[in-house]
Swiss-Prot record:
Primary localization: mitochondrion
Protein name in the entry: Zinc-type alcohol dehydrogenase-like protein C2E1P3.01
Protein family membership: Belongs to the zinc-containing alcohol dehydrogenase family. Quinone oxidoreductase subfamily.
InterPro entries: ADH-like_C, GroES-like_sf, NAD(P)-bd_dom_sf, PKS_ER, Trans-enoyl_RdTase-like
UniProtKB keywords: Mitochondrion, Oxidoreductase
Keyword Mitochondrion appears in the UniProt entry: yes
Organism ancestry: Eukaryota, Fungi, Dikarya, Ascomycota, Taphrinomycotina
Record organism: Schizosaccharomyces pombe (strain 972 / ATCC 24843) (Fission yeast)
Length: 348
């Protein structure tokens, strides 16, 4: 079986003798037809400390060919599903290979109204967005009956609204009934507003904090920093309302000190949804049952949200060529010379 692995020289290479996995109890075996890139893919594989031979890849779309014990064959065999695997943190269960196995509860069925490439843009970053906004901040998920959540006068600030995570945070916050203000580059303003932002701000503007406060009438009470750099988190916290007493800003991975005692920065790690422990370059990531339960709930509802147009996938930059195309495409992705698009490689 072909797979893409760390080559031990801060790069990746394609091999043809990787073992084909076998589904265990509660799992499926799928033939991978699409993979999408996330920053963790290149940041882990382009790293001298990663073990040579580690298989890479997180987001995938696959056609189910077999299932393990306890899984309804009539429901899954032949179905097209999408999810994300632990990837480089667990090289035995990663997406960049011809076949993949995973817990059937951690994938969603791809609806007919979106393409496999669009489907590949969702798993990891949508999970991250929902984990932060819905699980940790407690904002309601979009209804599944066509109704709407009640409107709120409070604002949610989304820093880096045009990132993959940010685009899904904007949509989820909008459907939660909150007003949304997002930072991004001006050329992405229209797209981010289409996704649900009420106001967009150029994060390059030296007065970005003052602009946010004025636009929201000093009413930002929740935030999600999808960039999660120390400087972006500091600016985001400063933009919170002067009236806030228990503000919360979601940060991916880390929890840096907050410049305001009344605003807490909450670091989230989406790997906690897997029922096993990971070592993230010396930092232990332990499983959290609530994160697994939340992910299962979200994946059950995601197919319907996509069918109804409640959730819009990221825009796609697609690469042909199968697994052999990944090394070159990954280098382009790592260069950062792209905006508001998700890199997807066709494997079939």
């Amino acid at each position: 079986m072909k797979a893409v692995i760390a080559d031990g020289q801060n790069g990746v290479e394609v091999i043809s003798d990787a073992p084909k996995p076998t589904p265990e109890k509660g799992e499926f075996l799928g033939r991978v037809i699409r993979v999408a890139f996330n920053p963790i893919d290149w940041k882990t594989l382009y790293n001298a400390s990663i073990e040579k031979g580690t298989v890479g890849g997180t987001d995938f779309v696959a056609v189910v060919e077999d299932v393990g014990e306890g899984v309804d064959r009539s429901k899954y065999i032949g179905a097209t599903v999408s999810g994300w695997a632990p990837g480089p943190l667990d090289g035995s269960n990663a997406a960049w290979r011809e076949y993949i196995t995973l817990d059937v509860n951690l994938v969603y069925f791809v609806p007919k109204n979106i393409t496999p490439s669009q489907a590949a843009t969702l798993p990891l970053t949508f999970t991250t967005a929902s984990q932060g906004l819905n699980q940790y901040l407690g904002l309601p998920l979009p209804p599944t009956d066509g109704s709407k959540n009640s409107a709120q006068q409070k604002w949610v600030l989304v820093w880096s609204g045009s990132s993959s995570v940010g685009q899904y945070v904007v949509q989820l916050a909008h459907h939660a009934g909150y007003k949304v203000i997002a930072t991004c580059s001006p050329h992405n303003f229209d797209w981010i507003k289409k996704l649900g932002a009420d106001f967009t701000v150029d994060y390059h503007d030296p007065n970005v904090v003052e602009i946010i406060k004025k636009a929201t009438d000093d009413s930002v009470f929740y935030g999600f920093d999808a960039a999660s750099f120390p400087e972006t988190s500091t600016l985001a916290v400063k933009a919170f309302s002067s009236k806030v007493k228990d503000g919360k800003l979601i940060n991916i991975l880390s929890s840096p000190p907050s410049p305001r005692s009344e605003v807490k920065i909450i670091g989230i790690i989406d790997y906690s949804l897997f029922n096993r422990e990971f070592n993230f370059f010396g930092n232990k990531i332990e499983p959290i049952q609530a994160s697994y339960d939340h992910a299962v709930e979200v994946y059950k509802k995601l197919t319907g949200w996509l069918q109804e147009g409640v959730i819009i996938p990221n825009r796609v930059k697609e690469f042909d060529g199968g697994l052999q195309a990944i090394p070159k495409a990954l280098r382009e992705f790592a260069s950062g010379k792209h905006s508001a698009v998700k890199f997807v490689v066709r494997i079939d």
